[in-house]
Amino acid sequence: MSRIGNKVIVLPAGVELANNDNVVTVKGPKGELTREFSKDIEIRVEGTEITLHRPNDSKEMKTIHGTTRALLNNMVVGVSEGFKKELEMRGVGYRAQLQGSKLVLAVGKSHPDEVEAPEGITFELPNPTTIVVSGISKEVVGQTAAYVRSLRSPEPYKGKGIRYVGEFVRRKEGKTGK
């Protein structure tokens, strides 16, 4: 049984939390995030520590308790440190370019794919085959990186495509001739 919800969240220096009727706003050096949480979970701030309390031990309350704590912790980490996902491109002629806030990908199609950066997300290109997606919201960073990856997922025969750095792609044998 997970006990994530019972863990205390420690506010780093420079991070402020405001709770107005379970609409929580977290401000930090990298920005500000706001999210509405369930009214069943009580959020208490004591100095630099945040604790969450549930009214009873029903299964539904336990799941909401753990989820709320994880989301709140991600907000605190996001505004203080930020999140990033790295993607790598493998394939002949596969490359990426930046045009303002737009990411332009050449991934073996007849046309280039363009990805507009959502609000709060930045794209970086350390080299033409590596893409770094960064921002303060873990959810939006993950969704944006997953969308970029979905434009050309790694295929199992040659491994060509866009993958997360360190991702293992299972390879298959090709057909054998007679």
Curated annotation (Swiss-Prot):
Keywords: Ribonucleoprotein, Ribosomal protein, RNA-binding, rRNA-binding. Signal peptide: none annotated. The gene is rplF. Belongs to the universal ribosomal protein uL6 family. Part of the 50S ribosomal subunit. This protein binds to the 23S rRNA, and is important in its secondary structure. It is located near the subunit interface in the base of the L7/L12 stalk, and near the tRNA binding site of the peptidyltransferase center. The keyword Transit peptide does not apply. Transmembrane segments: none annotated. Pfam families: Ribosomal_L6 (PF00347). One of its GO terms (molecular function) is rRNA binding. InterPro entries: Ribosomal_uL6-like (IPR000702), Ribosomal_uL6-like_a/b-dom_sf (IPR036789), Ribosomal_uL6_a/b-dom (IPR020040), Ribosomal_uL6_bac-type (IPR019906), Ribosomal_uL6_CS (IPR002358). NCBIfam families: L6_bact (TIGR03654). GO terms for cellular component: cytosolic large ribosomal subunit. This is Large ribosomal subunit protein uL6. It comes from the Bacteria. GO terms for biological process: cytoplasmic translation.
